[in-house]
From Swiss-Prot:
Documented EC number(s): 2.3.1.109
Annotated function: Catalyzes the transfer of succinyl-CoA to arginine to produce N(2)-succinylarginine.
Pfam family, one: AstA
Protein name: Arginine N-succinyltransferase
Gene: astA
Length: 344
C-alpha cells in the first residue's frame, strides 16, 4: 500500500537517490546530502514548533508500506520570502506610441517582482519514474491539500507553486541562456545548485533591476516563457484542475510558470470533510478513488481508497487503518481524488 507520511531523519539516503533522478532543474531537491539533511531537520523542527514562521516548512514522502521503499517527495513552505527575498518575473506590457508618427507598440516586458512574499508554497514535488503509475502522482501532489485543510491556521491565504520550466536532458535552458547567463556568468546547473543549497545572496547582487523587453531575448527563449518541462505538464494539469491559475509570473532561472490560488478555493481543501471510520470489509462497487487522511499533526498519513465520496461512515480494512495510524471511531478527512468531470 502506498502511504504519504511525514519525513524522518532516516530518509536522507532515499532522498539522495531521488535527487539523482531529477535531471536538474528541481532547485529544492539538490543531490547534496548536507542540504537534504538540513531540510529534513528543518521540517522536524517545524513540526516541533521550534521555528519562526519565516523558516517553517513541511516535507512528506510517499512510501510503499510493504517494502519501505521511498518513491517520492513533496513539501510545503509556510511563508516564502520573509527571510530571503523571493523573486520571480511578472510578465507585463510597456506601450511605446507616437501619434505623430502613427506608431503604437505594446511590448511584452519582464518586471522583477517580490509580489508573492508571505505566500505558502507547494514545492519539491518529485516521483521516481519507476513509480509513475496507479495514481501515485495524484496522491503525492494532492496529499498536501489534506494537510493544509486539517491545519488551515498554519498557512497563509494564498498558495503558489513554481512549475519547472523547459530544460533539456543536458541541463540546457533556453531562457537562462538568453537572459540569466548574461548577468550571472555561470551555467544554469551551477546557479540552480547554488540556489538549491541555500546560497541565494548572489541573486539579489546580480539580478537585473530594470524591466527587460522580451523581444531582446532569443526566439527560443521567448517561446518557453510560462511553459513547463514536458515531465511537469501532468503536475501543472493536476493543479489547474484544483483551481490554480497562471497569473503571468515566471521563474527567474528557467522561465517556468508560477501558479497560484486562494487557499480556501482549492477544490480538495474546500470539498474535504471529516467522517467517522470503522473497521470492516469495504463495500464492493465502481467507486472513485478518494484521498483519506488522518488528523494527526505529528504523525500525518494519507492513503488512496476506492469508496463513495459522499459516505458518512467510512469502512476501512485493518491494514488501511494501520497505515493511517487510526482506530475505529476516529474521524478522518475524505475527499474525491479528482474533480468530477462536468457533463454537458
Amino acid at each position: 500500500m502506498m502511504v504519504i507520511r511525514s519525513v524522518e531523519r532516516s530518509d536522507v539516503s532515499a532522498l539522495m537517490q531521488l535527487a539523482s533522478k531529477t535531471g536538474g532543474g528541481l532547485t529544492s531537491l539538490p543531490a547534496n546530502e548536507a542540504t537534504l539533511s538540513a531540510r529534513i531537520e528543518r521540517a522536524i523542527k517545524t513540526w516541533q514548533g521550534e521555528l519562526p514562521k519565516s523558516e517553517q516548512g513541511y516535507v512528506f514522502v510517499l512510501e510503499d508500506s510493504e517494502t519501505g521503499t521511498v518513491a517520492g517527495i513533496c513539501a510545503i513552505e509556510v511563508a516564502v520570502g520573509l527571510n530571503d527575498p523571493w523573486y520571480n518575473y511578472r510578465v507585463g506590457t510597456l506601450v511605446h506610441a507616437s501619434k505623430e508618427l502613427n506608431v503604437y507598440n505594446a511590448l511584452p516586458t519582464l518586471f522583477l517582482s517580490n509580489d508573492h512574499t508571505g505566500s505558502s508554497e507547494l514545492c519539491t514535488l518529485f516521483l521516481d519514474p519507476d513509480w509513475r503509475k496507479e495514481g501515485n502522482g495524484y496522491l503525492l501532489s494532492k496529499s498536501r491539500f489534506m494537510f493544509m485543510a486539517a491545519f488551515r491556521d498554519k498557512f497563509n491565504d494564498k498558495v503558489v507553486a513554481e512549475m519547472r520550466g523547459v530544460i533539456d536532458e543536458h541541463g540546457y535552458s533556453p531562457f537562462w541562456q538568453s537572459l540569466g547567463k548574461r548577468f550571472f556568468s555561470m551555467d544554469f546547473s551551477r546557479a540552480d545548485f547554488l540556489c538549491g543549497t541555500g546560497q541565494k545572496a548572489f541573486i539579489a547582487e546580480l539580478m537585473p533591476k530594470h524591466p527587460i523587453y522580451t523581444h531582446f531575448l532569443s526566439q527560443e527563449a521567448q517561446d518557453v516563457i510560462g511553459q513547463v518541462h514536458p515531465q511537469t505538464a501532468p503536475a501543472r494539469a493536476v493543479l489547474e484542475k484544483e483551481g490554480f491559475r497562471y497569473r503571468n509570473y515566471i521563474d527567474i532561472f528557467d522561465g517556468g510558470p508560477t501558479l497560484e490560488c486562494d487557499i480556501d478555493r482549492v477544490r480538495a481543501i474546500r470539498k474535504s470533510r471529516l467522517v467517522e471510520v470503522a473497521e470492516g470489509q469495504p463495500a464492493q462497487g465502481d467507486f472513485p478513488a478518494c484521498l483519506v487522511a488522518n488528523e494527526n499533526y505529528h504523525h500525518f498519513r494519507v492513503v488512496l481508497v476506492r469508496t463513495d465520496p459522499a459516505t458518512e461512515r467510512l469502512i476501512l480494512t485493518a491494514a488501511q487503518l494501520d497505515a493511517l495510524k487510526c482506530h475505529a471511531g476516529d474521524r478522518v478527512r475524505l475527499v474525491r481524488l479528482c474533480a468530477e468531470e462536468k457533463t454537458a
